[in-house]
Amino acid sequence: MRKQNSDFEARFISEEGSRLKNRDYFGYVELDEFACYVIADGITEVTDVESARLAIETVILSFQENPSLSKRTVKRLLKRANRALLGKESDRRLKASITVVVTDYQKMRYGYVGNTRLRMYRGGAVYRQTRDMSLAQEMVEQEKIAKDELMQHEERNNLYAYLGQKNFKPVVSKKIKLAETDMIALYTRGIWENVDEAELDDVFAEADNEVQTTVDNIEDLLLSRQPENLDNYTLAVIFVNKVYQNPEKRKRIKKIVMITVIVVIAAIVIGVVLWFLRDRKVQRTEDMNYHFTNTVEYINTGNYVRAKEECEQAQKLAEKL
């Protein structure tokens, strides 16, 4: 029911660039209650797509077996993909960068390792983004190189974390509540080596309701550079046109509001009663003191009859306090 009552639109491109083969891969599955989007960049120097394809197929199949939005699930998906690459018989070690996004059509969570990137936009501005696990990225953070130098820096693909290593430590985000008109971009190095972040931001800031137009605009921007050595490039864009709304949640909210109103009204009534009682007590105390003062004055003047009457009045008021 969630998928039918929400609208997530995904489009992608994946091309070999100037390479002989495309070692990038993108895949996704949209189930009734959950969806999973995965992008991978094979970084093994062989001419097939084994690393990225194997990683994504493993993630998608594992997700379909037990779909969930939990942090544990995202870690499990990435670890299974890592084991798949480690266990594959090959002349060369299989390695890849990967980014996984899972959603229940209300919230999302992502996990990644390597230098495939996620960039999420809300209201036309960057809302979330991944951080490359490369030496060049660390140099940027240490202010050894400028941020715009990372695109072509010689250490940009020198990764300290990736699929296919024994000490595997992926990064998994917290849950992110989705909003309508959110936009999510997943892309490989063929994109970010040639189109800088500011240019991407401009495209998404000016994006209309057509996700395919946004994908085409970014590819046009990339190809307009006419790079001599264009790596494989893959870009996937997901538009969140409508977030699933739980009908039971509306009932719960209404019930909570009604209970809150009742509690507030009760608190006001109790407050008024307490104030009234306190006000009466203050007035009685003042009256008691008045009669007691009169009692003393009548005693001093020798009017004992009036003194007795005033004393009795003061005593009655004291008993009511």
Model-derived features: positions:
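PP2C/PPM-type serine/threonine phosphatase catalytic domain
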Residues: 1-321
